[in-house]
């Protein structure tokens, strides 16, 4: 899908600098207001919608986050980051099966396509988003009561973690969830 870019190069740089500054200082309310203004000014820029969804998410406004993601998906349904953010929003709204559908869209893609495709940001980024999709899918499966599937996905996520590849989830957090699932599986066997 060819999209018209309405932001000039200078506007994009200013936008990115403002975005980075507000995020690094955890000024989520200010960021939300800024992005809402930018969305009015540039309604066809899907990345503004997906960044707005992140701001809503950080503020605990999960319904609004999902709505902003849906708008981004309508504008650019093939950007892996947009799909991932939409899956996160669905998960946050306890729409686990719907989130899995979106995560599967990411997991089915070839790593090189994610890394170097139209919206790609390199191999480390592709490895990161694909592996985090595994973990998020595991948590969705866990919430659906599918312990064995969740466990397999967490084991795979842990096996694919690499030094220098970012994750939204700490290793400690993942290991705790893995142990929880092991305990739950053992409890089912005992009963």
Q: What residues fall within each predicted segment?
A:
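TPR alpha-solenoid repeat register
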Residues: 48, 82, 115-116, 133, ...
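Conserved structural position within tetratricopeptide repeats
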Residues: 39-40, 70-74, 105-108, 159
């Amino acid at each position: 899908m060819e999209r018209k870019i309405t932001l000039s190069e200078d506007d994009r740089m200013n936008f990115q600098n403002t975005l980075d500054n507000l995020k690094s200082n955890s000024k989520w309310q200010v960021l939300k207001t800024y992005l809402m203004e930018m969305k009015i000014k540039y309604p066809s820029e899907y990345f503004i919608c997906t960044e707005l969804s992140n701001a809503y998410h950080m503020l605990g406004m999960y319904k609004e986050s999902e709505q902003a993601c849906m708008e981004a998906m309508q504008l650019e349904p093939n950007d892996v980051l947009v799909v991932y953010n939409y899956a996160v929003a669905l998960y946050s709204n306890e729409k686990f099966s719907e989130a899995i559908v979106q995560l599967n869209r990411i997991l089915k893609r070839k790593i090189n396509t994610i890394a170097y495709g139209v919206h790609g940001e390199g191999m480390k980024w592709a490895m990161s988003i694909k592996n985090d999709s595994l973990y998020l899918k595991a948590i969705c499966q866990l919430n659906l009561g599918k312990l064995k599937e969740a466990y397999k996905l967490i084991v795979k996520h842990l096996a694919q973690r690499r030094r220098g590849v970012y994750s939204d989830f700490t290793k400690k957090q993942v290991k705790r969830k893995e142990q929880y699932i092991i305990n739950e599986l053992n409890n089912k066997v005992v009963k």
